[in-house]
Amino acid sequence: MKENNKKTGLSVRSVVATGIGAAVFFILMKYIAIPTGVPNTNVNVAEGWLALIAGLFGPVVGFLVGVIGHTITDATYGAPWWSWVLADGVFGLLLGLSKRFLDLEGGDLSTKKLVQFNVWQIIANVIAWLIVAPIGDILIYKQPASKVFLQGAAATIVNILSVAIIGSILLVAYVKSRPKKSSLRSE
């Protein structure tokens, strides 16, 4: 009988990262939310954290951290708003696709990679907050289009800024804390 050595599911490291990532995401989203003036839309520093977690662990962990963290946060206010929970999951998934070109574990984050990441996060924000969230609000909750697209536009702008500032700082700080692949030599 031939044994199948193919890995399935998430690694222990990814499961732990998901749990810790979602817990920190919840704390940041719940307790460090800055109102924008648009109803139910805040400057969300948790999105900067999601950029680091997704960039380190990839799209599956990014998706799970966004969905779990947002669901728990919404549950503390009464009930999850599923269209925005899904949008956060999509955002985490899209940010996680940056793992390949960022290579944060390698200890080298060039200006070019950081610019590429920020261009990608702008695209990911537009998809999540100007497409997924408003269309979900219309389809699931029968919300007026003018309201939800205003909320989506505000969320897009503030989340782009949150990830560009907080996310970039976290990415750079993480890489500076890691040895470069070429810095260790055997003797």
Swiss-Prot record:
Q: Which spans are transmembrane here?
A: 15-35, 48-68, 77-97, 120-140, 155-175
Membrane topology per record = Multi-pass membrane protein
Q: Name one GO cellular component term.
A: plasma membrane
- Respond yes or no to whether keyword Ribonucleoprotein is given for this record: no
**Which UniProt keyword terms apply here?**
Cell membrane, Membrane, Transmembrane, Transmembrane helix
**Record keywords: Cytoplasm included?**
no
The record, for InterPro entries, names: ECF_substrate-spec-like, UPF0397
Subcellular location per UniProt equals: Cell membrane
Q: Which family does it belong to?
A: Belongs to the UPF0397 family.
Q: How is this protein named in the record?
A: UPF0397 protein LEUM_1974
Source species of the chain: Leuconostoc mesenteroides subsp. mesenteroides (strain ATCC 8293 / DSM 20343 / BCRC 11652 / CCM 1803 / JCM 6124 / NCDO 523 / NBRC 100496 / NCIMB 8023 / NCTC 12954 / NRRL B-1118 / 37Y)
